[in-house]
Structure formats: C-alpha cells, structure tokens
Design a protein with these regions (language model features):
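Domain-level signal for soluble alpha/beta catalytic cores
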Residues: 1-236
C-alpha cells in the first residue's frame, strides 16, 4: 500500500516517477477488439485488467493507472452503460489497488475527454461537462484512487472543467493534467505549449504535461518549451 511518503516523492520536483503504459493497447493485444467498451471489462472480465496491471507492476511502475479512460457518462452511453458510471469507475480503482497490494505504489484515476464538444465549440455546457467529470471522479475515489490523471485532452476549456471537478470532489488530491499536440506542436485547437503550461498551472494542476498523438521527439520539444513558463512538475 502506498504511504504519505509516496505522495511526497510523487510531488518532489527532483524525483522521477515512472508510470505504467497504455491500457487499451495491452487489452487489444489480448484479443479485446476496439468495438467493445474497454471500461466495462472492469466488471465483465476483471482478471484480464488485473493481468495488465500486474505486468506493469512487475516491470517497475511506480504508479498504476485505472482502466477508466472512457468511463464517463457520454462515452458509456454509446454502449448503453451510462447507468454504470460509478460502478465501473469504482471497480477500476479497486482492481488497480488490489494489484498494488502492500507495495509502495500509487493508484491514479485515469480520466479522459468526454467525447463531446463543450462550449464554445459545441453544445455541452461547461457546467454539464464538470458534472460528468465529477460523477466519474467520485467513483474512482470510492474505489481507492489516490490521484487523478487527466489525459489526452485537446481542448483547454474541457480540461479546465476536469481540473475544477477534481478540486470539487477532493480539494487536496494531486491532479496531473495532460494535453495532446499535433506534429505542428500545437493542440488541435491551436494552443501553444506555452499556452498549455500557463493555463494548466493557473488552474491549479499539480503536474502538467503532454501525452499521445505524436512521437517522443515532438513531445520532448514541446515539454522543453513548457518548462521555462511554469514551476510545476512536468509529465510526458
């Protein structure tokens, strides 16, 4: 089980923390096709999810991310599972926590975009978006998540609501906020790495960074542009 020292090391700017890797890719490699709801596996095939967590743990991960990237109401509704938001997120966190056991390993509740456009780019209001994130995060907390990782966001308006939701469900829980960029080094909505860093910093994320979409060299170049404009710990 993680300890207060685990979180202290996690937030220490001089300490490198190693996360696990992709969950969906690993599940796909085990025969789960992409037309299925991967989040539902937390209750339908928990042993498969446990096996992925265990493999990352044995590889040396300091943090296990929950299998909950798409476990929000709008995305689950595409599979007729919108009534199971709390159940699937709670199960996701419990699975990761069970695999971590008594090891000094943290469990991060993984939260991805809603899959719908939020204002001003779409019909979903900011209040609605924040409510969807809150609902998901409550399930993750109930299952034992010790921090939140907001991943692969394209829209700064949306990730702001996710950060605000995290603070509403637990004012002290560590929050990692990560955007995605294209080969031009910009977010899909045109934000520069500097814009991203300043915004995520101002909204109170404890760790800020980038993930997905482009290779490590492009990510590194963008992270190097973020570093001078923030004192936050960086993730990639």
């Amino acid at each position: 089980m993680s300890t207060p020292n685990s979180l202290s090391r996690f937030l220490d700017p001089n300490h490198i923390v190693v996360f696990d890797g992709a969950m969906g890719t690993m599940l796909y490699s085990r025969g789960v096709f992409i037309n299925q709801c991967y989040d539902e596996l937390n209750t339908r095939n928990p042993d498969l999810v446990r096996a992925v967590h265990d493999e990352y743990l044995r590889a040396g991960a300091d943090v296990l991310e929950t299998n909950s990237f798409g476990a929000n109401r709008p995305k689950l509704a595409q599979h007729g599972l919108e009534a199971q938001v709390h159940e699937l997120n709670r199960a996701a966190a419990r699975l990761a926590r069970d695999v971590a056991g008594d090891r000094d390993v943290l469990v991060a509740g993984a939260v991805g975009p809603l899959g719908v456009r939020v204002e001003p780019f779409g019909p979903t209001s900011l209040d609605e978006a924040r409510g969807y994130f809150r609902e998901q995060m409550k399930g993750l907390l109930d299952g034992g998540a010790e921090l939140f990782i907001l991943e692969t966001f394209s829209d700064l308006h949306e990730i702001e609501q996710a950060i605000r939701a995290a603070r509403e469900v637990d004012a002290t829980i560590p929050v990692i906020a990560q955007m995605t960029i294209g080969v031009d080094g910009l977010s899909p909505y045109g934000a520069t790495p500097e814009d991203i860093a300043r915004s995520l910093d101002a909204w109170g994320a404890d760790v800020i960074g980038l993930n997905c979409s482009v290779g490590p060299q492009r990510i590194l170049e963008a992270i190097e542009r973020m570093a001078p404009v923030t004192q936050r710990k960086l993730s990639a």
